[in-house]
UniProtKB/Swiss-Prot annotation:
Protein name (record): Phosphatidylserine synthase 1
Modified residue annotations for N-acetylalanine: 2
Major location category of this protein: endoplasmic reticulum
Topology within the bilayer: Multi-pass membrane protein
InterPro entries, A to Z: PSS (IPR004277)
Role noted for this protein: Catalyzes a base-exchange reaction in which the polar head group of phosphatidylethanolamine (PE) or phosphatidylcholine (PC) is replaced by L-serine. Catalyzes mainly the conversion of phosphatidylcholine but also converts, in vitro and to a lesser extent, phosphatidylethanolamine.
Pathway as given in its UniProt record: Phospholipid metabolism; phosphatidylserine biosynthesis
Topological domains annotated Cytoplasmic: 2-35, 94-102, 208-216, 308-319, 377-383
Family indicated by similarity: Belongs to the phosphatidyl serine synthase family.
């Protein structure tokens, strides 16, 4: 019996590995202030599920076959999300509630299974499914068939420039602001922005709407829309990095206004981590990981345009913008999990959301290739090879610039935004490269300096004035 117990004892490395992986895959909520929202309600959900199924099964009118199928699909999705709340991991985020991120992961699993299902259909069946969802898609036309691109580029007038500031320019701006919040690196954001414009050039022979005038690509897209969004997102990142996170309990707030503000702040991050994608002492594996990150990012963007071109629906259709919003939701935990896997030596496997996101990206590409064989038969392999080499070159150029900046202007001291309801520890280093020897300016783990520094920080937090749930000095 003793030998059996001893064989189950985990080593220190196993404990550290499980702790690091849990922080990105099963983040826990500490210092819970309202127990009701975090207490398990499995019996309640079971009773609700059984009663609701009995009600809809015996009371609704089932005379219309199409309504039966549609409502059956919605019910399957709804109850699958309930199972997601009960069984799936929280992921790296806990705000506004872990149940929300469990449902996001559940939706990503459903979308993954839907893509697998599409692979076993033919093109006519897929189109029939689309027409069943929206009969108006029978009359949809490709944008490339009714519009001209890159025409009279030498004619540059103020009226023509202003006409390009449409809803898509607005989407570019806010889209890049959100991307900057996720990536949190000027170098990588600008590299992805420039690389995407080059991607459009290399795939212009397949998608005519990628053709743009030079001033549209350089000035309007890269500098104004993308650049403005990157700047706004990074300003918000710097603001969140500089804040001191010390969340107060609802019980400690005695004013109605304070409780309302604290409830609103529940939808803000519990903490904010300064990221460092590349370190001068990082190994080649870190460089290859960032290159893979950029390839998957570009592939996900390409899928957006290939899907609507092959299956013929407008960019304004819900099939297009709902997919974009959905991909944006699952990208947030994916980037956090991939960054931890790439930079933390103790995290030796990717998170589940990151794994599912990668599969979704490649499955979408496979779906496009299967149902767009006529389109991809025109592919020029030389352009694809040049595109891969171009992405590799820009990646290495970006990383070299980041290393040069770090060596000449010094390393920025890493800051930890702590929160009382998180399990984040300042003793855990997030920016050691995989296979790297470690950075000299990073403090050793479990040192007295770290303990005293953490103690001083907790003392400082305990003395801070609590206002609307956030401690301010």
């Amino acid at each position: 019996m003793a030998s059996c117990v001893g064989s189950r004892t985990l080593s220190k490395d196993d404990v550290n590995y499980r702790m690091h992986f849990r922080m990105i895959n099963e983040q826990q909520v500490e210092d819970i202030t309202i127990d009701f929202f975090y207490r398990p309600h499995t019996i309640t959900l079971l009773s609700f599920t059984i009663i609701s199924l009995m009600y809809f099964a015996f009371t609704r009118d089932d005379c219309v076959p199409e309504d039966n199928i549609w409502r059956g699909i919605l019910s399957v999705i709804f109850f699958f999300l309930i199972i997601s709340v009960l069984a799936f991991p929280n992921g790296p985020f806990t705000r506004p509630h872990p149940a929300l991120w469990r449902m996001v992961f559940g939706l990503s699993v459903l979308y993954f299974l839907f893509l697998v299902f599409l692979l076993f259909l033919n093109f006519e069946q897929v189109k029939s499914l689309m027409y069943w969802l929206d009969p108006n898609l029978r009359y949809a036309t490709r944008e490339a068939d009714i519009m001209e691109y890159a025409v009279n580029c030498h004619v540059i007038t103020w009226e023509r420039i202003v006409s390009h500031f449409d809803i898509f320019a607005f989407g570019h701006f806010w889209g890049w602001a959100m991307k900057a919040l996720l990536i949190r690196s000027y170098g990588l954001c600008w590299t992805i922005s420039i690389t995407w414009e080059l991607t459009e050039l290399f795939f212009m022979h397949l998608l005519p709407n990628f053709a743009e005038c030079w001033w549209d690509q350089v000035i309007l897209d890269i500098l104004l829309c993308n650049g403005g969004g990157i700047w706004l997102g990074m300003v918000v990142c710097r603001f969140l990095e500089m804040r001191t996170y010390h969340w107060a309990s609802f019980k400690d707030i005695h004013t109605t206004t304070g409780k309302i503000k604290r409830a609103v702040l529940q939808f803000t991050p519990a903490s904010w981590t300064y990221v460092r994608w590349f370190d001068p002492k990082s190994s080649f594996q870190r460089v290859a990981g960032i290159y893979l990150f950029m390839i998957i990012w570009q592939l996900t963007e390409l899928n957006t345009f290939f899907l609507k071109h092959i299956f013929v629906f407008q960019a304004s259709h819900p099939l297009s913008w709902c997919r974009i919003l959905f991909i944006g939701c699952i990208t947030a935990p994916t980037v956090r999990q991939y960054y931890a896997y790439l930079t933390d030596t103790q995290c030796k496997r990717v998170g589940t959301q990151c794994w599912v996101f990668g599969v979704i990206g490649f499955l979408e590409a496979i779906v496009c290739i299967k149902f767009g064989q006529d389109l991809f038969s025109k592919t020029q392999i030389l352009y694809v090879v040049l595109w891969l080499l171009c992405v590799a070159f820009t990646t290495f150029l970006c990383l070299y610039g980041m290393v040069w900046y770090a060596e000449h202007y010094g390393h920025r001291e890493k800051t930890y935004s702590e929160c009382e309801d998180g399990t984040y520890s300042p003793e855990i280093s997030w920016y050691h490269g995989k296979g790297s020897k470690g950075s000299e300016d990073s403090p050793p783990k479990h040192s007295n300096n770290n303990e005293s520094h953490s103690s001083r920080r907790r003392n400082r937090h305990s003395k801070s004035k609590v206002t609307n749930g956030v401690g301010k000095k």
